[in-house]
């Protein structure tokens, strides 16, 4: 049986990401939110883990040693915190998409963003797991002129 789906090997994804250049990395962000498809998740809440990679040229900041020439990690952290701790959503996909789209919208210097969003405690699974989550990559549309 043949599938019409194409897959990309992890090594190919890593090469594609490395072609994007420099990146800011925020790893292991922890927030408490009320997202989930079942009522208990939306009323009791739970911990969410977030990793964000933001591709942006760091050359000018590296040469100038001036915060004005880069994007503050605190600003990206604050945006993610506001979304995860904000209005409840049914799906992790929606929360990750909001983080990615708002990051690209707010920080015009960022060319692409990768958001990994996970929850280590899943109410529907009565077994030990590290986490369940989503990993999305969004790239700025370079064909449109603003």
UniProtKB/Swiss-Prot annotation:
SUPFAM superfamilies: Tetrahydrobiopterin biosynthesis enzymes-like. Homooctamer. Forms a hollow cylinder assembled from two ring-shaped tetramers. InterPro entries: Dihydroneopterin_aldolase, FolB_dom, GTP-CH-I_C/QueF. This is Dihydroneopterin aldolase 1. Catalyzes the conversion of 7,8-dihydroneopterin into 6-hydroxymethyl-7,8-dihydropterin, a biosynthetic precursor of the vitamin tetrahydrofolate. Can use L-threo-dihydroneopterin and D-erythro-dihydroneopterin as substrates for the formation of 6-hydroxymethyldihydropterin, but it can also catalyze the epimerization of carbon 2' of dihydroneopterin and dihydromonapterin. Belongs to the DHNA family. Its EC number is 4.1.2.25. The active site is at 119 (proton donor/acceptor). The lineage of its organism: Eukaryota, Viridiplantae, Streptophyta, Embryophyta, Tracheophyta. Pathway: Cofactor biosynthesis; tetrahydrofolate biosynthesis; 2-amino-4-hydroxy-6-hydroxymethyl-7,8-dihydropteridine diphosphate from 7,8-dihydroneopterin triphosphate: step 3/4. Keywords: Folate biosynthesis, Lyase. It comes from Arabidopsis thaliana (Mouse-ear cress). Expressed in roots, leaves, stems and siliques. GO terms for molecular function: dihydroneopterin aldolase activity. It catalyses: 7,8-dihydroneopterin = 6-hydroxymethyl-7,8-dihydropterin + glycolaldehyde.
């Amino acid at each position: 049986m043949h599938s019409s789906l194409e897959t990309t090997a992890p090594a190919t994804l890593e090469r594609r990401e490395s072609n994007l250049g420099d990146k800011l990395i925020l790893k292991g962000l922890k927030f408490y939110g009320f997202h989930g498809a079942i009522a208990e998740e939306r009323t009791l809440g739970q911990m969410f883990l977030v990793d964000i990679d933001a591709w942006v040229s760091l050359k000018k900041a590296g040469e100038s040693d001036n915060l004005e020439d880069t994007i503050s990690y605190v600003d990206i952290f604050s945006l993610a915190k506001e979304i995860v701790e904000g209005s409840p959503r049914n799906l992790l996909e929606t929360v990750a998409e909001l983080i990615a789209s708002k990051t690209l919208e707010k920080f015009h210097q960022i060319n692409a963003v990768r958001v990994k969003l996970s929850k280590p405690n899943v109410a529907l699974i009565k077994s030990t797991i590290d986490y369940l989550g989503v990993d999305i990559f969004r790239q700025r549309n370079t064909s449109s002129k603003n």
